[in-house]
Regions:
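Short hydrophobic beta-strand element within catalytic cores of glycosyltransferases
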Residues: 37-38, 264-267, 286
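A conserved mid-protein helix/loop that constitutes part of the nucleotide-sugar donor-binding site
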Residues: 14-25, 169, 173-192, 205-211
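N-terminal strand-loop element at the rim of the active site
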Residues: 6-14, 18-68, 141-144
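Conserved acidic donor-binding segment of nucleotide-sugar-dependent glycosyltransferases
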Residues: 279-280, 284-286
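Short His-centered aromatic/hydrophobic patch
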Residues: 64-68, 85-92, 106
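Acidic anion/phosphate-binding donor-loop and adjacent secondary structure
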Residues: 67, 133, 148-168, 230
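Donor nucleotide-sugar binding/catalytic pocket of nucleotide-sugar-dependent glycosyltransferases
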Residues: 56, 119-156
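Aromatic "clamp/platform" in nucleotide-sugar-dependent glycosyltransferases that forms part
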Residues: 228, 247
C-alpha cells in the first residue's frame, strides 16, 4: 500500500484546516495508510486520535525553528513515505528533498517560492491551476482536485440559544473574521433589513471592529457573534439563507455547506463563488 505523510502548520481555525481534517478522516475511512505532522491543536488532535490516525505535533515556527526541520526529516527517514502531502506555505517550505513524491495543496494564490521543491501542485479551483500554469509551473504537474464537504444533514437548534426569536428571517455567515471576508459589508446591510437577524460564526482579528460597527449603526441586538463553531451544519440548518460576502474568496467551502443543508446561498461574486454558483439557478451572486 502507498504510504502517505501529511504535514500542516495551519491556524487553530480556518477553511484549509477544516478541509485537511475532513480529508484525513476520509482517507482513514477508505483504508489509506498515513501519518500526520501538524502544529499543536487540541481539538484536531482529538479528532485524529479518535479515528485511529497517528499524529505528531510540532511547533512549525519561523526560520530558526531547527527542531521542527530536524524532526520532520527524522520522521520521514523512519516512516519512508511514498507521498508527502504538504499544506500551505510554512509546512511545504521545510519538507526536505527525499525519495518520495512531494505534493502540495494550495487553496489560494500563494507565492510559489515556497513550493520550488515540490513535484506536483494541487489547486482546489481551476482558477488556481491557471495561476500555477501562468507562473510557469509545468502543465503536467499541476492538478485540479476540488474540495468536498460532509453530506450529513444538520439538525436545527433552538434559536433562543442565541436570543433569536422564532418567526423572523434568520441569515448566517461563517468564516475567519478578516477584512477579506467582508463581514463589515454584511453588517452594514443589516441596517436595511429591519426584521432580519444575523448569526456570524467565526473568530479573528476583526471581532472588536465588527462588534463596534454593529453597535454604531444600531444593529447589535440583531447581529449575534457566535465565535468559532464546530456544529456548522446544525447552525446552517436552523437559518433561512447562507450569505458569503467575501471580497476575496478563492473557493468558498461555505457555499458547498449551504448546498448540502439545502439552504439558499447568496454570495458576492468573488472568484470561488462565481465559479461555483450559476446565478439564479443554484444561488444568487451580487
Amino acid at each position: 500500500m502507498v504510504k502517505l505523510l501529511q504535514a500542516i502548520a495551519g491556524a487553530p481555525h480556518g477553511g484549509a484546516e477544516l478541509f485537511f481534517t475532513r480529508l484525513a478522516l476520509g482517507l482513514e475511512e477508505a483504508g489509506q495508510q498515513q501519518i500526520i505532522l501538524m502544529r499543536k491543536d487540541k481539538e484536531r488532535a482529538r479528532l485524529l486520535k479518535d479515528a485511529g490516525i497517528y499524529s505528531e505535533e510540532l511547533r512549525f515556527g519561523a526560520g530558526f525553528d531547527f527542531f521542527t526541520r530536524w524532526k520532520i526529516k527524522r520522521v520521514i527517514d523512519a516512516y519512508k513515505p511514498d507521498i508527502v502531502l504538504s499544506w500551505m506555505n510554512r509546512a511545504t517550505q521545510i519538507i526536505p528533498m527525499g525519495p518520495f513524491v512531494h505534493v502540495a495543496r494550495l487553496g489560494g494564490y500563494y507565492n510559489l517560492k515556497y513550493y520550488k521543491n515540490c513535484d506536483h501542485l494541487i489547486g482546489n479551483t481551476p482558477q488556481i491551476v491557471d495561476y500555477l500554469k501562468q507562473s510557469n509551473w509545468p502543465v503536467g504537474k499541476c492538478h485540479y482536485i476540488p474540495n468536498f464537504v460532509n453530506d450529513e444533514l444538520g439538525l436545527p437548534i433552538d434559536r433562543a440559544v442565541f436570543n433569536t426569536p422564532d418567526g423572523v428571517p434568520l441569515i448566517i455567515s461563517l468564516g475567519r473574521l478578516h477584512k477579506n471576508k467582508a463581514f463589515d459589508v454584511l453588517i452594514k446591510a443589516m441596517a436595511e433589513l429591519n426584521d432580519t437577524f444575523l448569526w456570524l460564526a467565526g473568530d479573528g482579528e476583526e471581532l472588536s471592529t465588527l462588534t463596534s460597527l454593529a453597535e454604531e449603526i444600531g444593529v447589535r441586538e440583531r447581529v449575534k457573534f457566535l465565535g468559532w463553531r464546530s456544529d456548522t451544519k446544525n447552525l446552517i440548518a436552523t437559518c433561512d439563507a447562507l450569505i458569503c460576502p467575501s471580497r476575496h474568496e478563492p473557493l468558498g467551502n461555505v457555499v458547498l455547506e449551504g448546498w448540502v443543508q439545502r439552504k439558499p446561498v447568496i454570495a458576492a461574486a468573488s472568484d470561488g463563488p462565481r465559479y461555483l454558483i450559476e446565478h439564479g439557478k443554484n444561488g444568487l451572486l451580487s
